[in-house]
């Protein structure tokens, strides 16, 4: 025996040595997914990715410190094979010896983690059912007996005393134990999935019964599992009480049980695996039992449901595996014994019996394990002590555990060291029979927690088997939580359902927890308590049912039973969630509160800890920061699963309630015994107090309405969307929980501060969800099913319409009143959530970090979200949902405002309440504005907790105004019903604006609503436009700053623009905006864009009055503006067409019709304009230095716009609050100096630019006033003012654009804005002048100056509506004055530019220099074409001031040159479409104002503007045309349509730009001038044709132009691809290329090719890629991640000799004849400040095929000649057969196709025609079966070659001989034997 033992040891030593060799140096685990670095070191893929993700720049190899990049990592298949073989050997060794190879590793996770994990992974994987499922199935069946026998042997061998146990359990248990952990349990779970589901139903039923009976008899089916859980709980209790004592105690009382289980669990717990171990054991036992019973199924279901959770449980199991091996033997034997016993008592007895057995083996084996565990525990304790994050995490898990008291007990051990009181909790939990159930569910929760703890302790727990890294794991947990929760619910029975809810909460918490573990911990704690309460309530019956409804949907069996109980409540919830729910929820709430109270009394310390954590977080949290962090992750999570993101929100919300929960808990603690409604009432009172404290006016009632509605809506979604069901179920469960908690909002509020807060947080989430549900439900539904979408839409519409009255769309008034109450409550909750978020944010990171990260994340998210939102009808809703989440805090704030307004409006009536609720929805976006307004820029920064409260209060006060607005806006509100998500939001905001503006605007709004009936979107746009125009006027004057600030806060990019502005307050607001999230930002941006557009068009009639009123009602205006912006954004988002509207708005806020048309037409149009908008933003980002934000151009655009508005908002706030001026000295002083004179309206619009422009503004104002006096005679003051307003808004958007788009865009905007304001012309002159004079600052200053100029113009226009037209002329006349003022502004801007980042400055400087150079070239070109334009321009000038026009043309020419240059340089060229459109629209507006009367000849200003616009359009559009002629045309058409008569000349210009406006091209002279300007462009060549079109357009009536606009939009939609590509120049150059290909010559001087350039980069490091990105932005080059037909350049990482590695993009670039150039081309071009000739940097060779084979050059030259004969694969039919590594088959086929071959999908499809030669391409090493490809040639009679033949041929661009690449074929017959050689 000794000898054999020695031999075994020798073998084990060898295996250990091999294992160590194959271990990852980082995680010390066996490398499952090996990746090798350039330095030939091998690591886990997880480890390396985690390492690389930790730093922004290149990371260093842990071993050799060489730089590592993701691109440099290569998968090592050989190494993975070694690992697999080693695992097989180890497995065989274990089977042969009966010893567990990883025993020692079980005790020391770190020492031998890899082997243990390998083995455990196998078992876990099998149990997981994710990987190697087939293997597991194959292995588990044959291995089960051997495993069982080996286990029995192993158990007997391993356990001296265990042998007794083993004897008792060996027969069933040994097998089942190992099998459970091994493949069998997972196998069984998989195999028994059906039976599990049945079992789940039964089990859940049982568990439901057991819930009631849990204490008495936890259902016999569940009894085994529960008994196991209870025993484990007992173990945990004892262990929790005293880990050491427990071990000793366990030995004494139940030596084996406690030592075996308790010790192992305790030891595991420190690692966070204790819960897992226990859960595994319980699961295993239950599995074993289940094998014999339904419990097995249930346990398996647990495994299934936990399988996602198993990812975690496996992780914990890996940590536990050490223990688990022992546990497997010991605990599993225990469980087996229990199985034999079948009864808890029996099981307990068995367990008791087991402990003695386990003692000796356990003790003998556990000593190192115990030591390790104790050390781990200490570390955990230290972590928890040092950082409450762990505590909160643990607490979080513990909270769920508290809910599942057993789980708490299990997890408490982690806390035990930390808190002495935890043991008490544990004891209580353990004592609670339900704890067993809870324990199981909590184990799932705890498992992830354990993983988190381990991660915290060890920094990384690389659990590939866990299926996801933490973040994805969290998401998975959320999704899985939903998916797994279903099985888990079945599994856990009522407890599982509770656990599921807990898990969901945990899951929902997990994403945030992952983001912010501390907060997560806190959030889970309260939510879990809520869940606990809910669970208990569920136990009570209806609450359980309701809470379990979501799970019930998943776990149909339980769902049925639960639904029986829950159906009434659920139906009530779905129907009138408030009323019906309120009563049941009252009991439920009381039950929940009782439970909460009991839980608080049970675990007061934990609650206190949670409270502490939450309190700390609350204090620390800063709303902005939190927003930043949460929205990105949240967005991502949302993208993955709405429920997850919503869960995250809930988590945040829950966290906030945690603070309140402290008080509530205190109250509950006082009333621990009283779990009755009495406790609920005190809790309610406490909640009310808390709510009242946070939002005195916002009684807790309102939120409930939201919640109830939300939950009801989400539930329908669940029912509707099975696919979404899980995620949505999670949402709905959360929502249901929320509903449960909110059903009796008052009770919830009253129920327990904690309960309410938790619920409130849930409710807040709910509210966010309400928006989400309103919109998000639609989104999720739309995501899943059209039916669901419709239902969701109905729900969301109802909810949107009845945001407050959401509870019952049928009961708008009742719902409103209830909702008002509920909303108030909900409002408090949102505030809490906001506070929570703020706290979390503060806790998590510093503002700067958060800003940067959150902005990036949010940009990414918003980028995706905005696209997704706009992509699909649901997407806008999704945007709304995003807005809700982002608004999360603000949404919560918004609910507050809504609540306030709603409550106030309650008196007003249902309509107002509806509006209010719409506002509430809007207030997510709008409230931030209100809050911002209330807070003012500085306060807004404080928007976090206190700010929120203040905002709430101020909102409440302002709510009155809001109410009025709402009342006025009621019609709009109703229209929003038509367009519920958008209009309501926008309407609410608009209502605010309207109230301030006047009833005129309301009338307009009313009309808009009517129009909305016909065109909801358009109406919404109009309504929003009207209100927005009014708001903007008033906002521009007074509230503009606030609204801008709100926009800023709404838009993430506002921060950057604010940074440019240099306003710390704005920055904070920007941060807040970022916090709100990309979607919200996108929506805000859209809303901002849209509102301006709408406002512009609407402001025509009410501009003056609103301005005056706004001045009078500055604060109201601010609120209105804030709300308005948000609503517009929201409406934009809800309405996908708004996307195009956005771009139109972005381009020029004037085109309300355009927006409407866009909305009408076109989702394509919206995409187009959205992209355009993005382009503009991108340009601005380039200029402004928003490069970091450039990731999402649309976000940038919106951000830039929003941020400008945000600045304005700040300014308006500053105006409202003079103290603000001091806060924002540069901007405020600049703005105030002039802006103060101007209406706040101009301030809001011009706030950003106003700073630098204030002086310029004064000059411009003077000149404009002079001009205005002239023009005012021509144009009716009303029209002028209106148009001026529009133009102002256009300028606002323009200024936003200009700041976004950079100087060029500014020029464009200025030019366009000059239509209304000749100021823009001077601005362009100034820009040009500055570009000439101010190389460095000019770009920035130009941007700022342009913005400023625009803004001054806007400001001037605001006070001087009539002057706006004159100001155009005056500005044109005083263009040089403007330049002077611009130079002054530049000096100011220089101060602002100081705010700009160095990178931004450099970029602007570079752009400026390039613009200057290109401008000279363009001027030359323009001069050539000027004769033509001058010919037509004289006619134009003849109509207006010819000198001005001439001047303008000159200015425009230079400006156009600059614009062209800039356009070519930056995405502005793309944006120019939108910009030009905006400008054109503005032009149209200005021309309208100038021509107040259609019959009037366009005033010289408008003409000059048109000329300017043409010039700009010509230059920009030229670039645009080059890039995207259609989009320019579309834009032109849009502008002309919008501006119609007034914009005839503009339309002509636009028409000139695009044929789209041909019907509109009536203004022949304008057209001619425009055409002559555009004559350079091919499209502009038909100047006469365009002129006729333009003339037609000018003659067209407004309605006609509007009709044309839709047509244009349609055309635009048709061309949307091009327009979109242009709009998103960064990402899309296809249309640009295609369009630009036509007109490169126009910008030939500026390198028309630039317009067409679309780059992809390959092999670059992140730093290098950022430089390429900067280069692309600077030169307006599209930079994409994937190569496409539009791609023109492939940037390769090369050495000094231009030799590169071979990559897929490299091959595709060569195959497509692209420019394959070295990265040095970019670096040198940047140094030279121009785009260098690619020939000198073309890649010459690669490391495989030769260093100078010139393949790329050959390929390009052959492509240039477009000679198909020169294609290397011409005449070949190639079939890419079988799997390929490192590239998709379609990419390989595309590569082959690009080289002239005909692609055949299957070898049997070869045509075998003459002149064609078939070839089969395979990759032998990618085939799993060696013989799979050897007979292919026989089937098709074609030569079979390796993929290398294709790659070598493509790389060299020379068809290689097949002989060296042929694969020998196995002849089927002698005759066929020669075929392979063919």
From Swiss-Prot:
Low complexity: bias regions = 590-601
Which function does this protein serve?
Answer: E3 ubiquitin-protein ligase that specifically mediates the formation of 'Lys-6'-linked polyubiquitin chains and plays a central role in DNA repair by facilitating cellular responses to DNA damage. It is unclear whether it also mediates the formation of other types of polyubiquitin chains. The BRCA1-BARD1 heterodimer coordinates a diverse range of cellular pathways such as DNA damage repair, ubiquitination and transcriptional regulation to maintain genomic stability. Regulates centrosomal microtubule nucleation.
GO MF annotation list: DNA binding; RNA polymerase binding; transcription coactivator activity; ubiquitin-protein transferase activity; zinc ion binding
Q: Subunit notes for this chain?
A: Heterodimer with BARD1. Part of the BRCA1-associated genome surveillance complex (BASC), which contains BRCA1, MSH2, MSH6, MLH1, ATM, BLM, PMS2 and the MRE11-RAD50-NBN protein (MRN) complex. This association could be a dynamic process changing throughout the cell cycle and within subnuclear domains. Component of the BRCA1-A complex, at least composed of BRCA1, BARD1, UIMC1/RAP80, ABRAXAS1, BRCC3/BRCC36, BABAM2 and BABAM1/NBA1. Interacts (via the BRCT domains) with ABRAXAS1 (phosphorylated form); this is important for recruitment to sites of DNA damage.
Question: Phosphothreonine is carried by which residues?
Answer: 1398
Query: What residue intervals correspond to the zinc fingers (RING-type)?
Result: 24-65
EC numbers: 2.3.2.27
Q: Which UniProt keywords apply?
A: Acetylation, Activator, Cell cycle, Chromosome, Cytoplasm, DNA damage, DNA recombination, DNA repair, DNA-binding, Fatty acid biosynthesis, Fatty acid metabolism, Isopeptide bond, Lipid biosynthesis, Lipid metabolism, Metal-binding, Nucleus, Phosphoprotein, Repeat, Transcription, Transcription regulation, Transferase, Tumor suppressor, Ubl conjugation, Ubl conjugation pathway, Zinc, Zinc-finger
Please give the superkingdom of this protein's source.
Answer: Eukaryota
Phosphoserine modification, residue list: 114, 392, 395, 420, 431, 692, 712, 751, 987, 1008, 1144, 1190, 1192, 1212, 1218-1219, 1281, 1331, 1344, 1391, 1427, 1460, 1527, 1545
> N-acetylmethionine-modified residues are where?
1
Where is the BRCT domain positioned along the sequence? Answer: 1652-1739, 1764-1863
- Specify the cross-link site (Glycyl lysine isopeptide (Lys-Gly) (interchain with G-Cter in SUMO2)): 109, 298, 336, 456, 516, 581, 1079
Which cellular component terms (GO) are annotated to the entry? BRCA1-A complex; BRCA1-BARD1 complex; chromosome; cytoplasm; nucleus
Q: Where is the composition biased (Acidic residues)?
A: 1344-1369
Gene3D superfamilies in the record: BRCT domain, Zinc/RING finger domain, C3HC4 (zinc finger)
* Domain note: The BRCT domains recognize and bind phosphorylated pSXXF motif on proteins. The interaction with the phosphorylated pSXXF motif of ABRAXAS1, recruits BRCA1 at DNA damage sites. The RING-type zinc finger domain interacts with BAP1.
Q: Which gene encodes it?
A: BRCA1
Q: Give the protein name, as stated in the record.
A: Breast cancer type 1 susceptibility protein homolog
Q: Where is this region: Disordered?
A: 303-329, 349-368, 548-614, 1134-1154, 1183-1221, 1315-1401, 1419-1504, 1570-1590, 1743-1764
């Amino acid at each position: 025996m000794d000898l054999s033992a020695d031999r075994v040891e020798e073998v084990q030593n060898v295996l250990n040595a091999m294992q160590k060799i194959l271990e990852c140096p980082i995680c010390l685990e066996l490398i499952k997914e090996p990746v090798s670095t350039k330095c030939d070191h091998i690591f886990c893929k997880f480890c390396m990715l985690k390492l690389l993700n930790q730093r922004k720049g290149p990371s260093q190899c842990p071993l050799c410190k060489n730089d590592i990049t993701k691109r440099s990592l290569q998968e090592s298949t050989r190494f993975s094979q070694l690992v697999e073989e080693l695992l097989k050997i180890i497995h065989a060794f274990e089977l042969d010896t009966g010893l567990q190879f990883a025993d020692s590793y079980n005790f020391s996770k770190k020492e031998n983690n890899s082997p243990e994990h390998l083995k455990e992974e196998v078992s876990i994987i099998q149990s997981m059912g994710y990987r190697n499922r087939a293997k597991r199935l194959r292995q588990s069946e044959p291995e089960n007996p051997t495993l069982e026998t080996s286990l029995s042997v192993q158990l007997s061998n391993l356990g001296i005393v265990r042998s007794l146990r083993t004897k008792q359990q060996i027969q069933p248990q040994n097998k089942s134990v190992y099998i459970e952990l091994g493949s069998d349990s997972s196998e069984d779970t998989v195999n028994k999935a059906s039976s599990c589901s049945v079992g789940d139903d039964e089990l859940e039923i049982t568990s439901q019964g057991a819930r009631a009976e849990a204490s008495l008899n936890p259902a016999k089916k569940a009894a085994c599992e529960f008994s196991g859980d209870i025993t484990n709980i007992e173990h945990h209790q004892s262990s929790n009480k005293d880990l050491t004592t427990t071990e000793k105690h366990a030995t004494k009382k139940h030596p084996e049980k406690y030592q075996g289980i308790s010790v192992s669990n305790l030891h595991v717990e420190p690692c966070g695996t204790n819960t897992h171990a226990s859960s595994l054991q319980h699961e295993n036992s239950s599995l074993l039992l289940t094998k014999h019973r339904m419990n097995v199924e249930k346990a398996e279901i647990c495994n299934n449901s936990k399988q996602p959770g198993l990812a975690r449980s496996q992780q914990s199991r890996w940590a536990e595996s050490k223990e688990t091996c022992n546990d497997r033997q010991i605990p599993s034997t225990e469980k087996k014994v229990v199985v034999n016993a079948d009864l808890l008592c029996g099981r307990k007895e068995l367990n008791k019996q087991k402990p003695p057995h386990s003692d000796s083996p356990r003790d003998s084996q556990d000593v190192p394990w115990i030591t390790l565990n104790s050390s781990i525990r200490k570390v955990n304790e230290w972590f928890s002590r040092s950082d409450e994050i762990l505590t909160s995490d643990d607490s979080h898990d513990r909270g769920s555990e508290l809910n599942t008291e057993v789980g708490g007990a299990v997890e408490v051990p982690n806390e035990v060291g930390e808190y002495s009181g935890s043991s008490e909790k544990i004891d209580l939990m353990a004592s609670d029979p339900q704890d067993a159930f809870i324990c199981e569910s909590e184990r799932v929760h705890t498992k992830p927690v354990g993983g988190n703890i381990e991660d915290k302790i060890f920094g990384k727990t690389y659990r590939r088997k866990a299926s996801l890294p933490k973040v994805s794991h969290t998401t998975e947990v959320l999704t899985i939580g939903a998916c797994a929760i279903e099985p888990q619910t079945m599994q856990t029975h009522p407890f599982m359902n509770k656990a599921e809810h807990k898990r969901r909460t945990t899951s929902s918490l997990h994403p945030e927890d992952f983001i912010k573990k501390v907060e997560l911990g806190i959030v889970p704690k309260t939510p879990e308590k809520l869940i606990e309460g809910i669970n208990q309530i569920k136990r009570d019956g209806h609450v359980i049912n309701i809470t379990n409804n979501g799970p019930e949907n998943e776990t149909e069996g339980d769902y049925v039973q639960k639904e029986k109980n829950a159906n009434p409540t659920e139906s009530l919830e779905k129907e009138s969630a408030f009323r019906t729910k309120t009563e049941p929820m009252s009991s439920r709430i009381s039950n929940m509160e009782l439970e909460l109270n009991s839980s608080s009394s049970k675990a007061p310390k934990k609650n206190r800890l949670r409270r502490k954590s939450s309190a700390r977080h609350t204090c620390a949290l800063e709303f902005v920061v939190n927003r930043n962090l949460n929205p990105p992750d949240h967005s991502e999570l949302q993208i993955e699963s709405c429920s997850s993101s919503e869960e995250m929100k809930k988590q945040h919300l829950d966290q906030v309630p945690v603070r309140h929960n402290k008080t509530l808990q205190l109250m509950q603690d006082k009333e621990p015994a009283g779990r009755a409604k009495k406790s609920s009432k005190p809790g309610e009172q406490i909640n009310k107090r808390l709510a009242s404290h946070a939002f005195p006016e916002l009684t807790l009632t309102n939120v409930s309405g939201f919640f109830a509605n939300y939950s009801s809506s989400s539930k329908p979604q669940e029912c509707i969307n099975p696919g979404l069901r899980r995620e949505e179920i999670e949402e709905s469960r959360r929502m249901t929980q929320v509903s449960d908690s909110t059903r009796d909002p008052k009770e919830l509020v009253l129920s327990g501060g904690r309960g309410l807060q938790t619920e409130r947080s849930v409710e807040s989430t709910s509210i966010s969800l309400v928006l989400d549900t309103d919109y998000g439900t639609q989104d999720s539904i739309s995501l899943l099913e059209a039916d669901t979408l419709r239902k969701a839409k109905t729900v969301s519409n109802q909810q949107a319409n009845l945001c407050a009255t959401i509870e019952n769309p049928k009961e708008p008034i009742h719902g409103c009143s209830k909702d008002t109450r509920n909303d108030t409550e909900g409002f408090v909750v949102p505030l809490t959530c906001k506070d929570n978020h703020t706290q979390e944010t503060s806790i998590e990171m510093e503002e700067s970090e958060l800003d940067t990260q959150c902005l990036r994340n949010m940009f990414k998210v918003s980028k995706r979200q905005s696209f997704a939102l706009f992509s699909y009808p649901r997407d806008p809703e999704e945007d709304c949902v995003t807005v809700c989440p982002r608004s999360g805090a603000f949404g919560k704030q918004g609910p507050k405002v809504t609540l306030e307004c709603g409550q106030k409006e309650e008196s007003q009536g249902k309509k107002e309440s509806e509006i209010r609720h719409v506002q509430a929805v809007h207030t997510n976006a709008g409230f931030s504005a209100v809050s911002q307004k209330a807070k003012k820029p500085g306060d807004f920064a404080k928007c976090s907790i206190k700010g929120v409260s203040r905002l709430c209060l101020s909102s409440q006060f302002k709510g009155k105004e809001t109410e009025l607005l709402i009342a006025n806006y009621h019609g709009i509100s109703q229209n929003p019903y038509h367009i519920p998500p958008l209009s309501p939001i926008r309407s609410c905001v608009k209502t605010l604006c309207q109230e301030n503006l006047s009833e005129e605007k309301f009338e307009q709004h009313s009309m808009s609503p009517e129009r909305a009936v016909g065109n909801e979107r358009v109406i919404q746009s109009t309504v929003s436009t009207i209100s927005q125009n009014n708001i903007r006027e008033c906002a521009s004057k007074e509230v503009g700053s606030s609204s801008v600030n709100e926009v800023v806060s709404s838009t993430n990019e506002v921060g950057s623009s604010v940074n440019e502005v240099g306003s710390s307050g704005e920055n904070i607001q920007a941060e807040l905006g970022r916090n709100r999230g990309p979607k919200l930002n996108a929506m805000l941006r859209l809303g901002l864009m849209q509102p301006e557009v709408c406002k512009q068009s609407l402001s025509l009639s009410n501009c003056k009055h609103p301005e005056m009123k706004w001045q009078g009602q500055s604060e109201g205006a601010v609120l209105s503006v804030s709300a308005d912006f948000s609503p517009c954004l929201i409406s934009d988002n809800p309405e996908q067409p708004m996307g195009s509207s956005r771009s139109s708005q972005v381009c020029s806020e004037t085109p309300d019709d355009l927006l409407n048309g866009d909305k009408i037409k076109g989702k394509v149009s919206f995409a187009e304009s959205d992209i355009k908008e993005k382009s503009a933003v991108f340009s601005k980002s380039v200029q402004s230095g928003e490069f970091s934000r450039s990731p999402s151009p649309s976000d940038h655009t919106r951000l830039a716009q929003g941020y400008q508005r945000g600045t304005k908002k700040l300014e308006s706030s500053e105006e409202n609050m003079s103290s603000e001026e001091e806060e924002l000295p540069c901007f405020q002083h600049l703005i105030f100096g002039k802006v103060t004179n101007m209406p706040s309206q101009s301030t809001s619009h011009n706030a950003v630019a106003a700073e630098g422009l204030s002086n310029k503004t004064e000059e411009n104002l003077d000149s404009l006033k002079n001009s205005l006096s002239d023009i005012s005679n021509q144009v009716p003051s009303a029209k002028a003012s209106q148009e001026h307003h529009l133009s102002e808004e256009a300028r606002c958007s323009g200024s936003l654009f200009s700041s976004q788009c950079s100087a060029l865009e500014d020029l464009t905007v200025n030019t366009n804005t000059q239509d209304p304001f000749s100021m823009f012309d001077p601005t362009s002159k100034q820009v040009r002048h500055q570009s000439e004079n101010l190389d460095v600052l000019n770009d920035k200053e130009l941007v700022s100056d342009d913005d400023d100029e625009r803004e001054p113009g806007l400001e001037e226009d605001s006070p001087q509506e009539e002057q706006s037209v004159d100001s155009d002329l005056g500005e044109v006349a005083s263009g040089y004055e403007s330049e002077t003022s611009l130079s002054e502004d530049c000096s100011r801007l220089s101060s602002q530019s100081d705010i700009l980042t160095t990178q931004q400055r450099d970029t602007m400087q570079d752009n400026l220099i390039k613009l200057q150079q290109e401008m000279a070239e363009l001027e030359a070109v323009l001069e050539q074409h000027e004769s033509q334009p001058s010919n037509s321009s004289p006619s134009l000038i003849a109509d207006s001031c010819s000198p001005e026009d001439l001047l303008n043309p000159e200015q425009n020419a230079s400006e156009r040159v600059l614009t062209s240059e800039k356009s070519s340089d930056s995405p502005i060229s793309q944006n120019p479409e939108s910009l030009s459109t905006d400008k054109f629209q503005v032009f149209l507006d200005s021309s309208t104002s100038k021509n107040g009367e259609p019959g009037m000849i366009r005033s010289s200003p408008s003409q000059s503007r048109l000329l300017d616009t043409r010039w700009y359009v010509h230059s920009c559009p030229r670039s645009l045309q080059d890039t995207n002629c259609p989009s320019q045309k579309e834009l032109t058409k849009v502008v002309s349509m919008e501006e119609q008569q007034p914009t005839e000349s503009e339309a002509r210009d636009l028409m000139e730009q695009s044929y789209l406006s041909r019907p509109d091209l009536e203004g022949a002279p304008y057209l001619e001038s425009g055409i002559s300007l555009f004559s350079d462009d091919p499209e502009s060549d038909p100047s006469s044709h365009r002129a006729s079109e333009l003339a037609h357009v000018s003659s067209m009536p407004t309605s006609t132009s509007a009709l044309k606009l839709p047509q244009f939009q349609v055309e635009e939609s048709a061309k949307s691809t091009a327009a979109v590509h242009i709009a998103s120049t960064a990402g899309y150059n296809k249309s640009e290329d295609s369009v630009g290909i036509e007109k490169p010559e126009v910008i030939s001087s500026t390198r028309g090719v630039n317009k067409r350039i679309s780059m992809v980069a390959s092999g670059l490091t992140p730093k290098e890629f950022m430089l390429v990105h900067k280069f692309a932005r600077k030169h307006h080059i599209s930079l994409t991640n994937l190569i496409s037909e539009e791609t023109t350049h492939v940037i390769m990482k090369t050495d000094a000799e231009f030799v590169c590695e071979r990559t897929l993009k490299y091959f595709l670039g060569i195959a497509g004849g692209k420019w394959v150039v070295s990265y040095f081309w970019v670096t040198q071009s940047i140094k030279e400040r121009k785009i260098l000739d690619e020939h000198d940097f073309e890649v010459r060779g690669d490391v495989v095929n030769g260093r100078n084979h010139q393949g790329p050059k050959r390929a390009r030259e052959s492509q240039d000649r477009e000679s198909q004969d020169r294609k290397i694969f011409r005449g070949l039919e190639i079939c890419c057969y079988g799997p390929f590594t490192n590239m998709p088959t379609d990419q390989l086929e595309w590569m082959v196709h690009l080289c002239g071959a005909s692609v055949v999908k299957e070898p049997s499809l070869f045509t075998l025609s003459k002149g064609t030669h078939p070839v089969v391409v395979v990759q032998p090493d990618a085939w799993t079966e060696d013989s799979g490809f050897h007979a292919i040639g026989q089937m098709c009679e074609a030569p079979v070659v390796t993929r290398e033949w294709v790659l070598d041929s493509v790389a060299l661009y020379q068809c290689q001989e097949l002989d060296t690449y042929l694969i020998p074929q196995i002849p089927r017959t002698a005759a066929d034997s020669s075929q392979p050689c063919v």
